[in-house]
Design a protein with these regions (language model features):
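Periplasmic/cell-envelope proteins involved in peptidoglycan metabolism and beta-lactam response
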Residues: 1-181, 190, 199, 272-280
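Beta-lactam-recognizing serine transpeptidase/beta-lactamase-like catalytic domain environment
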Residues: 61, 159-203, 209-291
Length: 291
């Protein structure tokens, strides 16, 4: 009887382990099945890292930006729009990892946990469509405004979370990839979205943080008069201003973006106070975009 009891216990343990494994697999399949389906090893779904068939990517006005058919990535008919939306949409070779083609590849594949990438009638699905919040027209205007300069233009609606425009330069036409893109220094960093993956000195926009800290920590700020001679010396370093403002109040210093006023205020406030307000306003934290 003891032998039978031990055998039963072992069988129960094996059965319970098997059941737990089945439950774990089913849960993993429903959660990660889409990611499994679009792995490069699934040659009938992907081709050179890109989806063989994918749904359409459109802008906020339903203008077509991209789709895939027979393993070939298709784009908007307008070359300027193709260049302006390249880093948001993605490139034909999948080198731009922050584009919608990569970020939403599971949705674009049309994967369904029940039928996979095949319809109930046995035919291959063409993928699911997604609509982005960007405007292709605004993006085109932003790229023209950059006028070939390296940088980025982003427009973000803080009330709704919508990204209306995210343009990065340098860029290229995904339907006419330059033959010297790998050797020409003009295309250095072209696969990076400068709005997301590059770092820049904040410049005058940081004066808003300095102003907020000064307003709350310097009681006589409104009655003070600063003097701008076009430059000032801070810790042995010369800080220059674009203009010679002369005697100037804090309010006018903010309106005129006077470097002398805000350099002196930053020194007076000190490192700890400036860091505190920078943290409170989110300058030292990451944030995520989904649009």
């Amino acid at each position: 009887m003891k032998t039978t009891g031990w055998r039963s216990l072992i069988l129960y343990i094996i059965g319970a382990g098997f059941l737990v494994g089945i439950i774990f697999f089913i849960c993993s399949y429903f959660i990660q099945g889409g990611s499994w389906a679009i792995r490069p090893s699934n040659a009938h779904i992907t081709n050179n890292g890109q989806l063989t068939y994918s749904g359409e990517i459109t802008d906020r006005d339903s203008n077509l930006l991209s789709y895939s058919k027979d393993g070939v990535q298709q784009y908007n008919d307008n070359a300027l729009i193709r260049k302006a939306t390249l880093h948001v949409v993605g490139d034909p070779n999948g080198y731009i990892s922050t584009g919608a083609q990569y970020a939403f590849r599971t949705q674009l594949s049309g994967f369904n946990p029940i039928t996979g990438v095949v319809s109930p009638f046995g035919s291959s699905v063409t993928g699911s469509n997604i609509k982005l919040t960007i405007s292709s027209d605004v993006s085109a205007a932003a790229l023209q405004a950059l006028n070939g300069k390296k940088g980025a233009v982003a427009v973000y609606n803080y009330k709704t979370g919508e990204v209306l425009c995210m343009v990065s330069s340098p860029t290229f036409d995904p339907l006419n990839i330059p033959s010297d893109i790998e050797t020409n220094s003009a295309y250095e960093g072209v696969y990076l979205n400068n709005a997301l993956s590059s770092t820049y000195t904040p410049g005058s926009i940081f004066k808003v943080i300095t102003a907020a800290a000064a307003i709350e920590n310097i009681p006589d700020l409104d009655s003070r008069t600063f003097h701008c001679s076009g430059s000032t010396i801070i810790n042995g370093e010369k800080i220059t201003c674009d203009s010679v403002h002369g005697d100037i109040s804090f309010q006018n210093g903010l309106a005129q973006s006077c470097n002398v006023v805000f350099a002196e205020l930053a020194v007076e406030l000190g490192k700890d106070t400036m860091t505190k307000y920078a943290d409170q306003l989110g300058c030292n934290t990451n944030f995520y975009l989904d649009g």
